[in-house]
């Protein structure tokens, strides 16, 4: 039964269509089986005519097919190569290669070719034969899998509906009826409620569906967990309008995410580096809610290539794993810190340790003028800290970066040394880089403990500024490790991460088209906030060829969930991408903008791994307070504040600005 498919998400109409196709398939197979039986009967008739009867006497020199006598001189040329029987000339069938077979052997070969038996004779020895229509038929009739979180009431309800051929559908409808009591169901353009549209599609996970019904997750407590004092739109079905005449399409990146068996619950032992959930419990629960499908224009002629797996959210990672610390003395050889390495935040999925940084790292540097190559010889480490103090255990390894390049192509890693605080590596890394460019770089060594399931612990780091080293001399050095320097003062981080050109426009509810998708907030009708992502300039190269495959992701804080998230298409192989894409947020009142913040982050797309952070901005009033509460994300400064205030001051007009990208989304000091 493991072959049975889960087709409970199909609608009644879709199931009826599938059953009609299966009916036609059954009729065709029966007709084909009838044809095969006729051919087999013809073969049996030929064999019957050539069979010897016990009532008659036959000579040894007779034809095995027609029983006619053969001459006295019998040669091997009269023997069939298929059955080794003597056959007369009349019972032979010539083949294309000049050889011949008897009528029976030739008919058997013809029958196998015509019926495909030659294929099934081989297939049955390797596979258990079961047609696709049989599997679908069983899948449509089977009882759906038991939900781990199924209540007793749902279980009893299901038992009373065992006679229904689609038992899963009625349970889903009952759940939707219960949800409809909790909140008002908005209406779509078609006149049907969002839940009715969802019921018709039955949780279809196909990313490129042309269905006009859109998913609507409307539980206010799930959408706005942090924003209880402010009004919020009752519907999260987004309509995005651009200042252009391109057509609108559905571009929700969440469909592909939920297409990938997201209902499987992993045990902690099954977690890997790429699937560790670093978000708080309430955020993790929100991720189970399917987001809206939004129409995004302009720039819709470009295929939506951003349906990737959910990348790490930078603010949550920073909030969970970064703490401010002061750099200790380089000569002391040790420093106390609570660690959170921003350099490894994206490649190692966070730091899970809290250790006292101790020890040194020994290495040598050499620059080969002929090949323009930096050669790094990582020798050993001395007296590292224990990642597990109770068990006195450390599994250290060393990573190197030539800052500001933090891409995967720029990372080098040693092997992992088990159960030692004095690891001996003796490994060599090479960077092909010109002498002039190398002088602008900073070589960073970071030591990590390799934990189970990717839960790595930061053990310390050290830096070498390349402009202070004479490249014509070999450098042998042993540096003390120290805690992570805060990103604001780190000399390895670039001062310029690029620029993002955006335009903002707020349209009051009174100016929205009559009869359109006008959403209401608690205080009345809400307006529409449009964010036009035009282009980015001089982004950081994240690929080995000096380019990036970038896209922009946006959140309208404090709502950090899938209903608030927007993405642009991916612009490949360029550091100056033109996105020409618009985000639209409905149901926003003008007075709400005082407590909101628009966060835009630029990412490099990595298909088989987590994405690389390239920079970001936050647009808001920059007071540090939202709805009377102190928040980290209300930290806009300079042009970020000016552009936001200009948009608020002139409703209905576009406010455009060029914003410097931040190197990290850590809270900035206000008043700068």
Curated annotation (Swiss-Prot):
Start and end residues, zinc fingers (FYVE-type): 63-105
Modified residues (Phosphoserine): 201, 204, 217, 221, 274, 489
UniProt-annotated location(s): Membrane; Cytoplasmic vesicle, Secretory vesicle membrane
Expression across tissues: Detected in insulin-secreting cell lines.
Membrane topology value: Peripheral membrane protein
Pfam families in the record: C2 (PF00168), FYVE_2 (PF02318)
The entry's keywords: Cytoplasmic vesicle, Membrane, Metal-binding, Phosphoprotein, Repeat, Zinc, Zinc-finger
Region of interest (Disordered), residue spans: 199-222
GO biological process: exocytosis; insulin secretion; intracellular protein transport; lysosome localization; multivesicular body sorting pathway; negative regulation of insulin secretion; plasma membrane repair; positive regulation of exocytosis
Molecular function via GO: neurexin family protein binding; phospholipid binding; small GTPase binding; zinc ion binding
Record-annotated C2 domain positions: 357-479, 508-634
Domain of life, source organism: Eukaryota
Residues annotated as transmembrane: none
A GO cellular component entry from the record: endosome
Domain (RabBD): residue spans on this chain: 4-122
Subunit structure of this chain's protein: Part of a ternary complex containing STX1A and RAB27A. Can bind both dominant negative and dominant active mutants of RAB27A. Binds STXBP1, RAB3A, RAB8A and RAB27B. Interacts with MYO5A.
Purpose: Modulates exocytosis of dense-core granules and secretion of hormones in the pancreas and the pituitary. Interacts with vesicles containing negatively charged phospholipids in a Ca(2+)-independent manner.
Protein name: Synaptotagmin-like protein 4
Species the sequence originates in: Rattus norvegicus
């Amino acid at each position: 039964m493991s072959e049975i498919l889960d087709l409970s998400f199909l609608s009644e109409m879709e199931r009826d269509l599938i059953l009609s196709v299966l009916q036609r398939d059954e009729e065709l197979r029966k007709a084909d089986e009838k044809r095969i039986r006729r051919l087999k009967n013809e073969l049996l008739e030929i064999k019957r005519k050539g069979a010897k009867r016990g009532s008659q006497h036959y000579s040894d020199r007779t034809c095995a097919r027609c029983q006619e006598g053969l001459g006295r001189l019998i040669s091997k040329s009269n023997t069939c190569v298929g059955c080794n029987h003597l056959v007369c000339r009349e019972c032979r069938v010539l083949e294309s290669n000049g050889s011949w077979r008897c009528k029976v052997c030739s008919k058997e070969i013809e029958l196998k070719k015509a019926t495909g038996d030659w294929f099934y004779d081989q297939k049955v020895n390797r596979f258990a034969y079961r047609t696709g229509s049989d599997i679908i038929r069983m899948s449509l009739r089977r009882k759906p899998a038991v939900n781990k979180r199924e209540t007793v009431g749902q279980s009893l309800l299901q038992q009373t509906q065992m006679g229904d051929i689609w038992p899963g559908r009625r349970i889903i409808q009952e759940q939707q009826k219960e949800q409809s009591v909790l909140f008002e169901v908005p209406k779509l353009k078609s006149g049907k409620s969002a839940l009715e549209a969802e019921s018709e599609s039955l949780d279809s996970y196909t990313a490129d569906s042309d269905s006009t019904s859109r998913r609507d997750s409307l539980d206010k407590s799930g959408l706005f967990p942090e924003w209880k004092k402010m009004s919020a739109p009752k519907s999260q079905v987004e309509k995005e309008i651009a200042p252009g005449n391109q057509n609108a399409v559905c571009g929700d990146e969440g469909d592909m995410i939920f297409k990938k068996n997201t209902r499987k619950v992993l045990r902690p032992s099954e977690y890997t580096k790429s699937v560790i959930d670093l978000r708080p419990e309430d955020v993790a629960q929100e991720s189970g809610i399917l987001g809206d499908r939004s129409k995004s224009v302009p720039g819709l002629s470009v295929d939506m290539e951003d349906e990737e797996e959910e990348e790490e959210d930078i603010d949550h990672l920073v909030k969970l794993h970064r703490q401010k610390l002061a750099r200790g003395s380089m000569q002391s050889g040790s420093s106390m810190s609570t660690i959170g390495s921003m350099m490894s935040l994206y490649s190692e999925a966070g730091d899970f340790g809290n250790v006292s940084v101790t020890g040194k790292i020994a290495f040598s540097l050499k620059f080969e003028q002929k090949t323009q190559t930096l050669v790094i010889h990582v020798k050993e480490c001395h007296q590292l800290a224990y990642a597990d103090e109770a068990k006195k255990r450390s599994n250290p390894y060393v990573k190197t970066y030539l800052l500001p390049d933090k891409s995967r192509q720029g990372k080098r890693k040693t092997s992992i040394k088990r159960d030692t605080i004095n690891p001996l590596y003796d490994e060599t890394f090479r960077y092909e880089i010109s002498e002039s460019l190398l002088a602008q770089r900073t070589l960073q060594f970071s030591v990590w403990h390799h934990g189970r399931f990717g839960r790595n612990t930061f053990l310390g780091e050290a830096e070498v500024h390349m402009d202070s080293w004479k490249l014509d001399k070999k450098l042998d050095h042993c540096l003390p490790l120290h805690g992570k320097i805060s990103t604001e003062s780190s000399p390895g981080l670039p001062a310029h991460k690029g620029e993002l050109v955006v335009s903002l426009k707020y349209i009051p509810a009174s100016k929205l088209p009559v009869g359109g998708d006008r959403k209401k907030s608690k205080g009345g009708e809400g307006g529409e906030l449009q964010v036009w992502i035009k282009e980015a300039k001089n982004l950081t190269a994240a690929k080995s060829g000096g380019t990036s495959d970038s896209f922009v992701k946006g959140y309208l804080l404090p709502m950090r969930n899938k209903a608030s998230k927007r993405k642009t298409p991916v612009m490949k192989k360029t550091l100056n991408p033109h996105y020409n894409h618009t985000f639209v947020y409905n149901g926003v009142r003008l007075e709400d903008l005082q407590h909101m913040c628009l966060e835009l982050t630029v990412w490099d797309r990595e298909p088989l791994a987590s994405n690389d952070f390239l920079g970001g901005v936050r647009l808001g009033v920059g007071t540090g307070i939202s709805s009377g509460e102190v928040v980290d994300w209300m930290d806009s400064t300079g042009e970020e504040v000016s552009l936001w205030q200009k948009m608020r001051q002139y409703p209905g007009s576009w406010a455009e600005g060029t914003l410097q990208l931040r190197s990290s989304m850590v809270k900035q000091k206000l008043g700068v």
